[in-house]
């Protein structure tokens, strides 16, 4: 890990709280359930730190009955590949961005509507409330089980190699990497950019070779992925919020004894709450660290971007796509969108 990442990630505290013991005897048993948990987050990212702690707690509290092995940094394949594997049962658990989950659960992407959430308070009220519950229900219909609390992938910022983004006009024709998601593609096309879908594992080389000129991610991801080595500008746009759902293969999750299922759910929920605090702290501390290694920051006015999206029909189109029920749940926490 880079020097910045090592210093910042070491600030992560031990996971807050543990689930109640299962009442199994003190002698550890051989693992009855050996499961894999894949993530696309780089080594050292709080997603992996907290999920490893959750897996350790699950193993300890079940006296080894449930052994969940963590495979970070796309070791089991790219995000879309791992999604296919967890649906087929080759992987039992997966930490997955909402943008990728939306491939099979379209409404999962609704939290990424451009400029919808004004702050974290609105995000957590929505995702821990009725909007998150609706997404989890739809995920079950796809034979996946989403854990109760979503992890934080942060508000997303735009980085570029050639010029800062100060207005919508700066995005005109910009070749920018986005996750393989219709919502991301639609957002940047509405802003007249040229979005290209590339898996995160291939992003660094794509920026290095100028296949794309820019990308958009949270500051912790920009840091952990060392993207500052191949980008020069970072515009604090806060244009979208994204999170990681921990999802399980339905059959694998339901095969666990009821008390083990409860413990797994509680452990991952505790991990998510702790990870959110990690990301908030990282986001607040990373900007000066990234400035020291050469990344140049600016803070554009968001009003022209919102006006461009409204005029393009972006909001109206996605309201039709997600449906009245889901859109009403979104606006319950964001207020009316243009």
Residue ranges and their predicted role:
Residues 2-122, 130-338:
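N-terminal secretory/targeting leader peptides
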């Amino acid at each position: 890990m880079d020097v910045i990442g090592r210093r910042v990630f070491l600030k992560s505290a031990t996971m807050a709280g543990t689930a109640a013991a299962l009442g199994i005897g003190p002698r550890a048993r051989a693992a009855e359930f050996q499961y894999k948990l894949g993530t696309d987050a780089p080594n050292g990212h709080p997603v992996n730190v907290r999920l490893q702690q959750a897996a350790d707690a699950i193993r300890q509290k079940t006296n080894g009955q449930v052994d969940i092995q963590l495979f970070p940094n796309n070791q089991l394949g790219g995000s879309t590949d791992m999604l296919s594997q967890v649906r087929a049962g080759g992987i039992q658990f997966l930490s997955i961005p909402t943008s990728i989950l939306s491939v099979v659960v379209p409404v999962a992407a609704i939290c990424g509507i451009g400029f919808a959430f004004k702050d974290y308070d609105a995000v957590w009220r929505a995702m821990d409330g009725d909007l998150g519950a609706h997404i989890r229900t739809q995920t079950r219909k796809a034979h996946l089980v989403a854990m109760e609390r979503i992890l934080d992938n942060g508000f997303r910022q735009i980085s570029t190699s050639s010029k800062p983004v100060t207005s919508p006009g700066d995005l005109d024709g910009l070749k920018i990497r986005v996750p393989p998601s219709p919502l991301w593609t639609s957002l940047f096309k509405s802003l007249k950019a040229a979005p290209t879908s590339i898996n995160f594992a291939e992003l660094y080389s794509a920026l290095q070779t100028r296949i794309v000129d820019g990308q958009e991610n949270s500051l912790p991801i920009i840091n952990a992925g060392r993207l500052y080595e191949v980008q020069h500008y970072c515009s604090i746009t806060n244009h979208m919020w994204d999170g990681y759902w921990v999802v399980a293969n339905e059959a694998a999750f339901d095969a666990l004894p009821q008390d083990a299922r409860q413990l797994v759910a509680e452990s991952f929920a505790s991990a998510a709450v702790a990870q959110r605090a990690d990301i908030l702290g990282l986001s607040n501390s990373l900007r000066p660290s990234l400035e020291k290694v050469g990344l140049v920051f600016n803070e554009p006015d968001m009003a022209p971007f919102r006006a461009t999206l409204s005029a393009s029909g972006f909001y109206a189109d996605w309201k039709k796509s997600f449906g009245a029920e889901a859109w009403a749940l979104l606006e319950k926490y964001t207020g009316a969108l243009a």
